[in-house]
């Protein structure tokens, strides 16, 4: 269904045309209109006035079928086509009107308008000149003269645009073409010429816009679809590239360049889709391998290299391989300093490496470009908590393990340190006190890091054994006394209070 506002707008644009229809309401007799045709014409006119374009069109189709030599039927059908934005369909009807009634200046004037919009300047000028020679009304004469002046200006601008293009002055050519296309809005060739200028000037997205318009204005425009596909490909948009090259092959399945390009895009698209599926499954090493294949498949297109590295950076970060993640993310950020995805992934890698200042800096930079991203906000808050925590007691440092250490590594480190710092090993009173404090920290670290829930709290910047951290202040940092840890074996897999442990 056509929107009422759209209908009003389109009818308004052909309003002078509709006035002519009113003048024609009594001319049916001149054409020898039979009763059925007259009925279709009158009903169609009422429906058109009411904005019911599809229904009006059906009536005028019936009128044309009933009397193929009735110029009024063709004229009114052309009016509906124009109101529906179907100028291509209107043009043959207007031509038929002129064939049937050569002195019908309104139809010739309207055809001149359409030809001018299509950029067919010589044909448009011919219509306007014939209008002036056919005893036009005062308004028709003024309109024809005005359009002749406009057409002459378009001829001059077109010549200047072509000269500028031939001289490789693409900026000047674009300026001239901009002015022409304000009038000759349906000129496919000029849009394609401007697209070439945009490509030369490094503005591929503007070129795509013109080429898309051209693909609709010109039938079977395989060349436009091919160029759109290659431009999307060079921009790194493999999905849209694949979609556009398929449109080319729908028009001509034997198109050599489109078919060759289709095979290349399809291969790349399959690799990327496979890699993304592996990422969803958490198979990061396999995904990295796929993206490395993407870079080998299309080394000549920079966009695929940088996008592949961006995803490899993400995989390393998620796979908790911080050194590799930082290296690859940094390569991306050297080229694209504001790449939010790479900033987030590198920040996560910095957290694993306990480089909190660097993580905070990356999160803050990312937030400048995407302030509403919840992941960035939460990451920044976590990094700030961990920085503050690192200035207090750090259980990972106490045991000498990395933040991504497995439970087995934590238990192994704990046992080694517990044996080393057990107070029973020290006879000197001062050394014993120092060992007691050290042993308490070691045991606390083991308790927190071997318990998944407590470890998660600590990883989020909260010390589960610190009253101040737990309650937001108001208490002293929690340290268990040596007495509370006695009877606790570093080799026990259960809780801390099994039996007294002695070294002999």
From Swiss-Prot:
Residues 375-393 are annotated as: Flexible linker. InterPro entries: DnaJ_C3_Co-chaperones (IPR051727), DnaJ_domain (IPR001623), J_dom_sf (IPR036869), TPR-like_helical_dom_sf (IPR011990), TPR_rpt (IPR019734). It is found in: Endoplasmic reticulum. GO terms for biological process: cellular response to cold; negative regulation of endoplasmic reticulum stress-induced eIF2 alpha phosphorylation; positive regulation of translation initiation in response to endoplasmic reticulum stress; protein folding in endoplasmic reticulum; response to unfolded protein. Gene3D superfamilies: DnaJ domain (1.10.287.110), Tetratricopeptide repeat domain (1.25.40.10). It comes from the Eukaryota. Disulfide bonds join 248-258, 313-329. GO terms for cellular component: cytosol; endoplasmic reticulum. Keywords: Chaperone, Disulfide bond, Endoplasmic reticulum, Phosphoprotein, Repeat, Repressor, Signal, Stress response, TPR repeat, Translation regulation, Unfolded protein response. Coiled coil: none annotated. Residues 1-31 form the signal peptide. The modification Phosphoserine is found at residue 274. TPR repeats lie at residues 37-70, 72-104, 105-138, 154-187, 189-221, 222-255, 268-301, 306-339, 340-373. One of its GO terms (molecular function) is protein-folding chaperone binding. Residues 394-462 form the J domain. Residues 451-481 are annotated as: Disordered. Its main location: endoplasmic reticulum. Interacts with EIF2AK4/GCN2; this interaction occurs under endoplasmic reticulum (ER) stress, hypothermic and amino acid starving stress conditions and inhibits EIF2AK4/GCN2 kinase activity. Interacts with EIF2AK3. Interacts with EIF2AK2. Forms a trimeric complex with DNAJB1 and HSPA8. Interacts with THAP12. PANTHER family: DNAJ HOMOLOG SUBFAMILY C MEMBER 3, LD25575P. Involved in the unfolded protein response (UPR) during endoplasmic reticulum (ER) stress. Acts as a negative regulator of the EIF2AK4/GCN2 kinase activity by preventing the phosphorylation of eIF-2-alpha at 'Ser-52' and hence attenuating general protein synthesis under ER stress, hypothermic and amino acid starving stress conditions. Co-chaperone of HSPA8/HSC70, it stimulates its ATPase activity. May inhibit both the autophosphorylation of EIF2AK2/PKR and the ability of EIF2AK2 to catalyze phosphorylation of the EIF2A. May inhibit EIF2AK3/PERK activity. The J domain mediates interaction with HSPA8. Binding to misfolded proteins is mediated by a hydrophobic patch forming a large groove within the first two TPR repeats. This is DnaJ homolog subfamily C member 3. It comes from Bos taurus.
């Amino acid at each position: 269904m056509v929107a009422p506002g759209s209908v009003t707008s389109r009818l308004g644009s052909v309003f002078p045309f509709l006035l002519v229809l009113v003048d024609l309401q009594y001319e049916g007799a001149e054409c020898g209109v039979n009763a059925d045709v007259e009925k279709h014409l009158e009903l169609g006119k009422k429906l058109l006035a009411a904005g019911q374009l599809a229904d009006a069109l059906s009536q005028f189709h019936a009128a044309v079928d009933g009397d193929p030599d009735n110029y009024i039927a063709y004229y009114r059908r052309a009016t509906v086509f124009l109101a529906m934005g179907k100028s291509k369909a209107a043009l043959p009807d207007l031509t038929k009107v002129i064939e049937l009634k050569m002195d019908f200046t309104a139809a010739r004037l309207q055809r001149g308008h359409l030809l001018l919009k299509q950029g067919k300047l010589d044909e448009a000028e011919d219509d306007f000149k014939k209008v002036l020679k056919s005893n036009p009304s005062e308004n028709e004469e003024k309109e024809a003269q005005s359009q002749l002046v406009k057409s002459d200006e378009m001829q001059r601008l077109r010549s200047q645009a072509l000269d500028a293009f031939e001289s490789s002055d693409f900026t000047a050519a674009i300026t001239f073409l901009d002015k022409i296309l304000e009038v000759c809005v349906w000129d496919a060739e000029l849009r394609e010429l401007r697209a070439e200028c945009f490509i030369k000037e490094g503005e591929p997205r503007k070129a795509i816009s013109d080429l898309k318009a051209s693909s609709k204005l010109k039938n079977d425009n395989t060349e436009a679809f091919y160029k759109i596909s290659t431009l999307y490909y060079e921009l790194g948009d493999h999905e849209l590239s694949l979609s556009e090259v398929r449109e080319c092959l729908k028009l001509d399945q034997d198109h050599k360049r489109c078919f060759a390009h289709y095979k290349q895009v399809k291969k790349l698209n399959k690799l990327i889709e496979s890699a993304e599926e592996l990422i969803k499954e958490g198979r990061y090493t396999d995904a990295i391998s796929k993206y490395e294949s993407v870079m080998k498949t299309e080394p000549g297109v920079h966009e695929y290299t940088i996008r592949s590295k961006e995803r490899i950076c993400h995989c390393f970060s998620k796979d908790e391989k911080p050194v590799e993640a930082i290296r690859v993310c940094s390569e991306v950020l050297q080229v694209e300093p504001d790449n939010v995805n790479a900033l987030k992934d590198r920040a996560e890698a910095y957290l694993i490496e306990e480089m909190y200042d660097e993580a905070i800096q990356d999160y803050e930079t990312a937030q400048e470009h995407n302030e509403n991203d919840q992941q960035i906000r939460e990451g920044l808050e976590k990094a700030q908590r961990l920085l503050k925590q690192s200035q207090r007691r750090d259980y990972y440092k106490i045991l000498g393990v990395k933040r991504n250490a497995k439970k087995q590594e934590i238990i192994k480190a704990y046992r080694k340190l517990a044996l080393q710092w057990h107070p029973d090993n020290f006879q000197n009173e001062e050394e014993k006190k120092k060992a007691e404090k050290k042993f308490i920290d070691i045991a606390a670290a083991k308790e927190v890091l071997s318990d998944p829930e407590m470890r998660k709290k600590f990883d989020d910047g909260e010390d589960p054994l610190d009253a101040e951290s737990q309650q937001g202040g108001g208490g002293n940092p929690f340290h268990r006394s040596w007495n509370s840890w006695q009877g606790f074996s570093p080799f026990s897999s259960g809780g801390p209070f099994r039996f007294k442990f002695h070294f002999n």
